[in-house]
Curated annotation (Swiss-Prot):
GO molecular function terms noted in the UniProt entry: fructose 1,6-bisphosphate 1-phosphatase activity; metal ion binding; sedoheptulose-bisphosphatase activity
PANTHER family on file: FRUCTOSE-1,6-BISPHOSPHATASE 1 CLASS 2-RELATED, FRUCTOSE-1,6-BISPHOSPHATASE CLASS 2
Family annotation (Pfam families): FBPase_glpX
This protein's name: D-fructose 1,6-bisphosphatase class 2/sedoheptulose 1,7-bisphosphatase
InterPro entries attached to this UniProt entry: FBPase_class-2/SBPase
């Protein structure tokens, strides 16, 4: 993939974040999502690529979405043959969440961001809109903790890997009734729990950075966001495992289908032969090159949110690549009026 693509996808998430941030605190989560989708689609369609959405968003709550299978990029146009050389063109798979944490935006809460991951065709796992059991941990614990182990066992391993006492560890868990026993087990083991209402992509990624005071993500969340988290952790060298949840009784909702049997049939129709398989980040994001980008909508652990000022907007983004050992935080001032105004603080 072209090295300039990293800069292009930063602009994609920036535009989505800016559009969504205008609806921060207005209680309109679907509108905040809709404008982010439209802004993301518009910017992606200006990139010299043939992209295909393999992880979309919005299916669970019938919100607007960049639908699975949608093609984006200049080279998907009908007249593309005149300016896109097929011999030089790389087909790209894209996983998106234009507004990760729609409720967070709607109610003015921290932790929402616009995110996407890209790889060459076939490089990202096309996860169904199911739930996924997840385990994320820092690079030092990669291959040592395991999703099949209990939370208590993993905390002991994590303590050894990080050279910290269990009491110093902080585990992020989504605040859901299904996690009642998990939360109690973590607390009984001596670790601390940080409950979040939404936005587990940010929590997963934060495990890979020192100084965030987040040492693990545990529990069940959405599978599509699991693939995006895995792409980021693949780039960062962190630990991520995911296992699809196909039994509605596990999460006590009907959001993943009416029956266990029906869900198993759906997975089989998608070519998933072992529904109980545990995937690591190299399997969920298996491409030779994986790029991840995010832009804060509201303030979060890693990035500031969008800040509006007279004459412009300021954003903070993150871009990482599996091909390099760098995580670039990009602070951008978008000047909107003349004379140009740059606000530094």
């Amino acid at each position: 993939m072209d090295s300039t693509l990293g800069l292009e996808i930063i602009e994609v998430v920036e535009q989505a974040a800016i559009a969504s941030a205008k609806w921060m605190g207005k209680g309109e989560k679907n509108t905040a999502d809709q404008v982010a989708v439209e802004a993301m689609r518009e910017r992606m369609n200006k990139i010299h690529m043939r992209g295909r959405i393999v992880i979309g968003e919005g299916e669970r709550d019938d919100a607007p979405m960049l639908y699975i299978g949608e093609e984006v990029g200049i080279c998907t146009r009908e007249d593309a043959k005149s300016f896109c050389n097929p011999d030089e063109l790389v087909e790209i798979d894209i996983a998106v969440d234009p507004c990760e944490g729609t409720n967070l935006v709607a109610y003015g809460q921290n932790g929402s961001m616009a995110v996407l991951a890209i790889s060459e065709k076939g490089g990202l796992f096309a996860a169904p809109d199911f739930y996924m059991k997840k385990l994320a941990a820092p690079p030092a614990a990669k291959g040592h903790v395991d999703i099949d182990k209990s939370a208590t066992e993993n905390l002991k391993i994590l303590s050894d890997c990080l050279n910290r006492s269990i009491e110093e560890l902080v585990v992020v868990v989504m605040d859901r009734p299904r996690h009642k026993e998990l939360i109690q087990e973590i607390r009984n083991a001596g670790a601390r729990v940080r409950l979040i209402s939404d936005g587990d992509v940010s929590a997963a990624i934060s495990c890979a950075f020192s100084g965030t005071n987040i040492h693990a993500l545990m529990g069940i969340g959405a599978a599509p966001e699991g693939v995006i988290s895995a792409a980021a952790m693949r780039c960062l060298g962190g630990h991520f495992q995911g296992q699809l949840i196909y039994d509605p009784e596990v999460v006590k909702t009907g959001l993943i289908g009416e029956s266990r049997e029906g869900n198993l049939e759906r997975l089989a129709s998608m070519g998933i032969k072992n529904p109980d398989q545990v995937y690591n980040c190299e399997e969920l994001a298996c491409g030779e090159t994986v790029l991840f980008a995010a832009c804060g909508i509201t303030p979060g652990t890693l990035m500031e949110g969008v800040r509006f000022f007279h004459g412009g907007v300021r954003t903070q983004s993150l871009v990482i690549s599996s091909q390099s050992s760098t995580a670039r935080f990009v602070d951008t001032v978008h000047m909107k009026e003349s004379p140009k105004v740059i606000q530094l603080h």
